Design a protein with these regions (language model features):
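Membrane-interface coil-to-helix junctions
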Residues: 1-69, 110-112, 204-207, 213-214, ...
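Alpha-helical transmembrane segments with an aromatic anchor "belt"
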Residues: 53-59, 77-88
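Membrane-embedded helix bundles of polyisoprenyl
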Residues: 63-75, 85-128, 133-172, 181-204
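Short, charged/polar low-complexity linear motifs in solvent-exposed/disordered segments
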Residues: 173-174, 219
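Membrane-interface helix-loop-helix junctions at transmembrane boundaries of multi-pass membrane enzymes
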Residues: 177-179
Length: 220
């Protein structure tokens, strides 16, 4: 099994006990010492054996990757003068590329950090369209939050937020700013902040926190 599975197993074991430490890790290190790449997936390891939970992450990641890439390419082809009238060709190409993306050797322990990017881009681009219904917008917002809950801020989240913010600034300067996309960006940021709040507080020395294992190494 991948080494990241240890983080899921220990965090799942102490998910509801209210403890700030993991007794089995480094003789009782802080919970923030083991961060999970896809925090919401800890529920799988709480309910299922490790091998089954990891398999579920692989299947879910590949599925989201395939669907996201398929929808993204299908949407892009609608605006193409060459491909807009060739739905059969577009469908075949989208299916082929989607399958290729779904079978890329991404590690399942990272959740949607890689697999979920095409679907995120698709949702963000559709939010720019003003003719979307409220129900559709809510679905796009829901996926943005779902992506944040099942991806890592360190692995891909910071890059997504940064590139997205630059895009919003450029759009604002060109007077093409989308309020819906701005709301989605804020939702993703808040999701990451909620997930990593304890870690940020420890980094900035806010409140009481346990001594990190790295600090203990330095002291000894």
């Amino acid at each position: 099994l991948d080494g990241e599975v240890i983080a899921y197993l220990l965090q799942a074991r102490h998910l509801w006990d209210g403890s700030d430490i993991l007794p089995e890790f480094m003789n009782g290190a802080a919970r923030t010492a083991l961060t999970m790449p896809a925090p919401a997936c800890v529920l799988l390891y709480r309910l299922l054996p490790a091998e089954t939970a990891l398999a579920c992450m692989q299947v879910a990641g590949s599925f989201v990757g395939y669907v996201g890439m398929f929808l993204l390419l299908w949407w892009a082809a609608e605006d193409s003068e060459i491909l807009s009238g060739r739905k059969g060709t577009v469908g075949f190409l989208a299916m082929t590329v989607g399958c290729m993306y779904a079978y890329l050797p991404f590690l399942p322990v990272y959740g949607l950090s890689q697999y979920g990017l095409p679907m995120l881009l698709y949702c963000v681009l559709r939010l720019r369209e003003r003719d979307r219904s409220i129900r559709e917008r809510l679905l796009y917002y829901a996926y943005v939050v779902f992506f944040g809950a099942n991806s890592s801020l360190v692995l891909s989240g910071f890059a997504v937020l940064g590139i997205w913010a630059v895009g919003e600034i450029i759009a604002a300067l060109r007077r093409k700013y989308s309020t819906a996309q701005g709301i989605a960006w804020i939702l993703l940021l808040l999701t990451y902040l909620l997930e990593n709040g304890a870690l940020f507080l420890q980094i900035f020395g806010v409140g009481e926190s346990t001594v990190s294992h790295k600090a203990e190494y330095a002291l000894t």
